[in-house]
Structure formats: structure tokens, C-alpha cells
Regions:
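Short alpha-helix plus adjacent loop in nuclease-associated cores
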Residues: 5-10, 39-40, 130-154, 166
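Conserved helicase C-terminal RecA-like lobe
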Residues: 101, 115-127, 140, 147-389, ...
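Well-ordered alpha-helical segments embedded in enzymatic catalytic cores
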Residues: 18, 84-91, 145, 265, ...
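RNase H-like polynucleotidyl transferase catalytic core
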Residues: 33-34, 127-136, 358
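Acidic, low-complexity intrinsically disordered tails
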Residues: 382-428
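Conserved helicase NTPase motor core
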Residues: 1-20, 36-40, 239
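Metal-dependent catalytic core segments for phosphate chemistry
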Residues: 8-12, 19-20, 45-46, 50, ...
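Helicase P-loop NTPase motor core
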Residues: 27-30, 35-128, 151-155, 187
Length: 428
């Protein structure tokens, strides 16, 4: 059994051609199409079928159901990502008042960095949620590392922060040396960083370790001076670059790109706060309130992670060209990448049993600047008879039907340095 329309793991080596070539590879085999659907309503199936029909390489089938009830797929345009999070949180609360359980609702994102806005909004409104397939945003290792740098810049007395990042990235400061520093600090009632300042002028540690620690202290002092006159989010970008943390993630071909996207989202979210102190207090509050959810919780996950699952109500945010479909996928594999992205959209829509909500933002904050986005071409491929559109004043729900994304993420991102060039802003 296989479904060419749900082949979404090309980046893992899964070949949709294996299904498309089946009749050639096994001549005489009988093909049985399973087209009757018992999960979704006719409007959801109609929208999904109309969307996937735009793919050139597929065997072709039309899903149908006897269930003619249910709402049309709702397509909403909003001003920016934060407005999108507010909209979906409001829709969740409305559905809950109508008797829908939290666990019967899911938010399916294209990229993990999108989760941050929804997590923070849900915490603020005391909406229980669970991130499926990975840790919550502020619990991710790269986010905790970044926060540890900020906390140590803000306060030399934060020994937990010191212990976390004194050798991240690797500086040649081994665990034995770190434990010796912490022991000495406790023995003399000092902070770990104060103890280091004394140790680097003695011969109690190896010369190589003392040099590494001296460089670390010098970097911290420089970043602390920078924080006195520079916006805190720019300080964060500088720390990630100068510490070697960004380069460490670039070297990780398995998950480094995802971590860099999360760090990018982190620096952008910091811009909503006037000071570093205010930001860190906000993080502490969110972490304190976010004690984990019980069984009845909104499910947040990536579209890839949602394959095989189903929910009565599904929210599909971020349907903007360049974000979804992913510009990187299209750049890497062209039409094949676009078609796999479309299959991913099809999977997302068909996770919904009763209601599906698609949303797109007119603006996304990128590298400290607002970037104008256009609705995903997938929005324009949804059959009108199966959707209900609603946009904020001045926003359009109709995308420009271009491959590279004229005016959207595809072109606007080109004006900024990619993470291949670090956390830069517009090139000079």
C-alpha cells in the first residue's frame, strides 16, 4: 500500500518514483485505488484534491466521502506572525467554548521556529498545549545555550549559566577543570566567573586551559560592554557569531539548519522587549507558567510529524511563498521540491476531520527588518467552492502565481545574508 500524494520524505531518501514506476516495474499488477475517505468532510477533501491536482508527477485519484456536512476550509490573512498567533489562540478558545476538547485541535507548522509565537500566546492565555516530536521552544538546547550567554552577560553570579556554556562551543576546557573551578568558587564563596578571573593568573590549571579561560573572560567582558550601548538582540547576534556558536551549527549537517532557524526566531522575538533584563524576566515567567500539559492539550507539531495522525480541528499557519512552499526546497530540487511541498500541504489538510483553518501573514520579521510576504501559491490552488476567505483590511488572500516568489519570501530573502553568512542584516 502506498500513496504517491503523501510522499513527503524526499530529503530522507524516499523516492516518489518508486510508486510512480510501479506498473512499469511490475507489469500485469492490478492497481486498486482507495478513494473513499472516512475521515474528512467533502469540503476538506475537495480543497485537498484540488490542491494536489496541480502536481504533474502523480498517479491520480479523487478522494470522496458520503459526509456532506462540515464547514468550508477557512483561509485567513493577517498582518504579521504575532497576529496569526493571536488569531489561532482566539479560534482555539472559541472552539473550546463550543465543546471541542483541546486535544482535538492541532497546529501544524512547516518549520519548528514557527512554534515560538504559538507557545508564548498559549502560555499567556493558559491554553494547555503539547509539542509533539521535540522539546518546547524555550527548552531546546540551542535556546538554553543562547539564554545562558545572555544571563552570564547580565550577571557574573550565574554559575548555572557559566557551567552550561563555558565550553560550548568547545574551547578545550575539560570537565575536570570546570569542576575544579566550581569547587574553588564554593570553597571561597565566589561566583565561578570571579574564581576564573583569579585562576587565570596562577599555575593551578594547565597553561592551555588558562589561555582558553582568559579568552572566554575577555569575550564576556567585551559583550557586556557592548550590551551597554547596543540593542540586546544585536548583542545576541554578535555573541552567537563571535563565540563560534553559529559556525558550530553550520558544521552540523543533520540538524544545524533547524537550530539556526530557531536562533533566528529567538533574536527576532527579543526585539519586542526594551531591555535584556525585561526579555529574560519574560522567559523566566513563560518557563514558570509552562509546567507541562495533561492529556487534554492542543497539539503543536510540524507537518512532517503529523503524517498518519488526524484531528477534528486543524490550524495550518504560515502559508506564505518562501516559507511554505519552502524556498530552500525549491532552490535545492526545483519543480520536484515544489511538488513535494504541495504533497506536504495535502497531508496537512487531510489531517483535519471536521474543520481546517489556513492562515498567512502579510509581514514577517527577518533579521531585524519587516519583510513583505505574499500568500502561498497553494492558497490560490484551493478550489473556491471549498474555501471561505477572510483577510484583515488591506490584505489579499490571492497569491501571485510565480515559481520563484516575486515580492514574497523567495525574492525578499535574497536581499539578506543567509545563515551561510551568519546572522547578518542587509548587505552594505
Amino acid at each position: 500500500v502506498g500513496d504517491d500524494d503523501q510522499s513527503i520524505y524526499g530529503w530522507r531518501g524516499a523516492e516518489v518514483d518508486n510508486i510512480l514506476r510501479f506498473e512499469r516495474d511490475f507489469p500485469g499488477a492490478k492497481i486498486i485505488k482507495l478513494e473513499r475517505n472516512y475521515r474528512s468532510t467533502s469540503h476538506i477533501l475537495g480543497a485537498a484534491s484540488g490542491l494536489i491536482a496541480a502536481n504533474r508527477d502523480r498517479l491520480g485519484k479523487t478522494l470522496w466521502t458520503e459526509d456532506d456536512s462540515g464547514d468550508k476550509v477557512r483561509v485567513r490573512g493577517v498582518w504579521d506572525g504575532e497576529a496569526e498567533a493571536r488569531l489561532i489562540a482566539d479560534e482555539v478558545e472559541t472552539a473550546r467554548r463550543q465543546g471541542v476538547k483541546y486535544s482535538d485541535m492541532a497546529v501544524l507548522v512547516r518549520a519548528s521556529f514557527q512554534m515560538r509565537a504559538f507557545e508564548e500566546r498559549f502560555v499567556m492565555l493558559a491554553i494547555p498545549y503539547a509539542v509533539i516530536g521535540g522539546p518546547r521552544f524555550f527548552e531546546r538546547a540551542e535556546i538554553r545555550d543562547a539564554h545562558a550567554y545572555l544571563r552570564l552577560i547580565l550577571s557574573e553570579d550565574d554559575d548555572l549559566a557559566f557551567e552550561r556554556i563555558v565550553n560550548v562551543p568547545k574551547r578545550g576546557i575539560g570537565d575536570t577543570s570546570v569542576q575544579k573551578i566550581l569547587h574553588l568558587a564554593r570553597q571561597h564563596d565566589l561566583s565561578a566567573l570571579t574564581a576564573v578571573r583569579g585562576l587565570i593568573n596562577t599555575d593551578e590549571l594547565q597553561a592551555r586551559t588558562r589561555t582558553a579561560l582568559a579568552n572566554f573572560v575577555r569575550d564576556l567582558d567585551r559583550w557586556r560592554d557592548l550590551a551597554a550601548s547596543t540593542p540586546h538582540w544585536q548583542v545576541m547576534e554578535t555573541v552567537l557569531e563571535e563565540s563560534g556558536y553559529t559556525d558550530m551549527q553550520k558544521a552540523d549537517r543533520t540538524s544545524g539548519q533547524t537550530r539556526l532557524e530557531n536562533l533566528k526566531e529567538l533574536t527576532q522575538s527579543m526585539q519586542s522587549f526594551e531591555t535584556l533584563q525585561a526579555y529574560l524576566e519574560h522567559v523566566a515567567l513563560v518557563m514558570d507558567l509552562d509546567r507541562g500539559a495533561g492529556d487534554d492539550a492542543v497539539q503543536i507539531m510540524t507537518l512532517h510529524g503529523a503524517k498518519g495522525l488526524e484531528f477534528p480541528v486543524v490550524f495550518l499557519p504560515g502559508w506564505e511563498d518562501g516559507l511554505f512552499p519552502s524556498q530552500r526546497s525549491m532552490d535545492d530540487t526545483g519543480i520536484a521540491g515544489l511538488e513535494e511541498e504541495r504533497r506536504l500541504a495535502y497531508v496537512g489538510l487531510t489531517r483535519a476531520r471536521r474543520r481546517a483553518h489556513v492562515s498567512h501573514a502579510a509581514n514577517r520579521r527577518m533579521h531585524g527588518s519587516w519583510v513583505t510576504a505574499i500568500p502561498s501559491r497553494f492558497v490560490g490552488e484551493l478550489p473556491e467552492q471549498h474555501i471561505e476567505t477572510d483577510a484583515a483590511p488591506g490584505l489579499s488572500a490571492a497569491p501571485a502565481p510565480t515559481f520563484g516568489g516575486a515580492g514574497g519570501f523567495g525574492s525578499s530573502f535574497g536581499g539578506f545574508r543567509d545563515f551561510g553568512g551568519g546572522f547578518g542584516s542587509r548587505p552594505q
